[in-house]
Curated annotation (Swiss-Prot):
Any GO BP: chaperone-mediated protein complex assembly
Protein name per UniProt: Proteasome assembly chaperone 2
Gene3D superfamilies in the cross-refs: PAC-like subunit
One cellular component (GO) term of this entry: nucleus
Length: 261
């Protein structure tokens, strides 16, 4: 599944893997773009899979003509040895009938690389919140039992809120509860897979709605940065530290031509 660009096939076992869910507003994918662009993480390989919608484009992180000619595909892997960080960026949808196959291949690769921890950036429909979720922070997290012990104190100190469980049958049986992440794509099932495989994995997500989700990506990344310290903040202001890719200038298309006025 993973095809390296160079001779390196795997990663050292102390690396952290960051990846996005393909979820509402593409918040996780936008946040991953910011990480790659800000830290200038070089590409080390890509995923060869038939589980994603085929896609190819120009390099989204380069603005000069020469480097922008480099092609990007639907699933690429980046690595930054100085921070022991690996990043997987997904740029197209998972084919519905192949979602399970994709998750299995992803889990298999994670196990082979023996990543120290895996962090999935995701989002969830804001309109599905219950009354208790309408107040306070819009961020939630989930951690697998394998990771719980090592991060429990840190997350408690950060005052993060765990994703609440909701009734499986509202109004009929409130005793049976489950984790429900509407609009989260493969988030819930991938989390369940990691629990079954005893992987050290965490989900960090934000409640949001479809629209201009760039601010959601910035805020989600700031939340993650409190834990991982990817970039240093100055006087508590970390927003200015994130660098948006040049390709974001065309996020909503080119400007209106003056001739129409």
């Amino acid at each position: 599944m993973f095809v390296p660009i160079g001779s390196e096939q795997d990663f050292p076992s102390d690396y952290t893997l960051l990846l996005p869910a393909i979820s509402v507003g593409n918040v996780g994918q936008l946040a991953i773009d910011l990480i790659i662009s800000t830290l200038k993480i070089p590409k080390v390989g890509y995923f060869y899979t038939d589980c994603l919608v085929p896609m190819v484009g120009s390099n989204p992180y380069e603005t000069d003509e020469e480097n922008a000619k480099e092609l990007c595909t639907n699933a690429e892997v980046y690595a930054l040895p100085s921070q022991k960080l690996a990043v997987l960026q997904l740029r197209s949808l998972v084919i519905k009938k192949k979602s399970k196959s994709f998750r299995q291949a992803l889990v298999s690769w994670i196990k082979r690389c023996a990543f120290a921890r895996v962090i999935l950036l995701s989002s969830c429909h804001a309109y599905h919140r219950d009354d208790t979720q309408l107040f306070g922070t819009p961020f939630r997290y989930l951690v697998t039992p394998a990771l719980q012990k090592s991060v429990a104190d840190v997350l408690k100190e950060l005052e993060w809120k765990e994703m609440e469980k909701v009734s499986s049958y509202p109004g009929l049986n409130d005793n049976e509860k489950r984790v429900f992440i509407p609009g989260g794509g493969f988030t819930k099932r991938f989390y369940d897979d990691c629990c079954l495989e005893d992987l050290q994995m965490a989900v960090v997500l934000k409640f949001c709605s479809e629209g201009d989700n760039v601010p959601d990506a910035f805020s989600l990344l700031n939340q993650v940065n409190e834990w991982l310290h990817l970039v240093a903040s100055t006087n508590g202001d970390v927003l200015a530290k994130w660098k948006a890719p040049g390709s974001w200038q065309l996020l909503f298309g080119s400007g209106l031509p003056a001739a129409i006025f």
